[in-house]
């Protein structure tokens, strides 16, 4: 069974006014997202998830990660995103990103892990007023990558304290 690397990175100041940090990037549907690596515990390939009766629709179930029970969240359902469309010959490279949010751990389902990138804080732009998919209140900013954008999520705003408490009690 693959457990993926446990990621332990810290922000590295590059210069007095130019702080660089790392983002774990992944695909959800047709969009590319990033999360500050400081909030990521590890990345795990798809495993068995046990459904939970009466859980919110966006909760896929729970996952046993080395004797620790982790709730698994489907951001497609939470934010009404389209599922990834796979062409013949495409390989599904999905799994979970295990996050540390407040004092809780939770997993989010991803369609495809991309890579870890270093980004300068000045490269992060405010999110556009009109953005499709995930609401602007959950977005830290966007980073231009060639002709497209990487949406940087703020994991501390994805769930309220009350929601995190409910997830911890599943």
From Swiss-Prot:
InterPro entries linked to this entry: CheW (IPR039315), CheW-like_dom_sf (IPR036061), CheW-lke_dom (IPR002545)
Annotated signal peptide: none
Record key words, sorted: Chemotaxis, Cytoplasm
Main location: cytoplasm
Pfam families with a match to the protein in the record: CheW
Gene Ontology CC: cytosol
Keyword Electron transport: no
Disulfide bonds: none
Domain CheW-like residue range list: 20-164
GO biological-process terms attached to the record: chemotaxis; signal transduction
SUPFAM superfamilies: CheW-like (SSF50341)
Role this protein plays: Involved in the transmission of sensory signals from the chemoreceptors to the flagellar motors.
Record protein name field: Chemotaxis protein CheW
């Amino acid at each position: 069974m693959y457990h993926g690397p446990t990621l332990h990175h810290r922000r590295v100041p590059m210069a007095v006014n130019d702080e660089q940090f790392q983002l774990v990037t992944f695909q959800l549907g047709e969009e590319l997202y990033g999360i500050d690596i400081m909030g990521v515990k590890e990345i795990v390939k798809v495993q068995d998830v046990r459904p939970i009766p009466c859980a919110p629709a966006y909760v896929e179930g729970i996952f046993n990660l080395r004797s620790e029970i982790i709730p698994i969240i489907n951001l497609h359902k939470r934010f009404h995103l389209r599922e990834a469309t796979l062409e013949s010959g495409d390989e599904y490279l999905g799994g979970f990103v295990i996050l540390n949010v407040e004092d809780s751990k939770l997993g989010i389902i991803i369609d495809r892990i991309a890579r870890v990138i270093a980004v300068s804080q000045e490269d992060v732009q405010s999110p556009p007023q009109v953005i499709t998919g995930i609401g602007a209140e959950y977005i830290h900013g966007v980073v231009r990558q060639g002709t497209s954008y990487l949406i940087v999520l703020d994991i501390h705003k994805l769930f309220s304290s009350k929601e995190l408490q409910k997830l911890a009690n599943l």
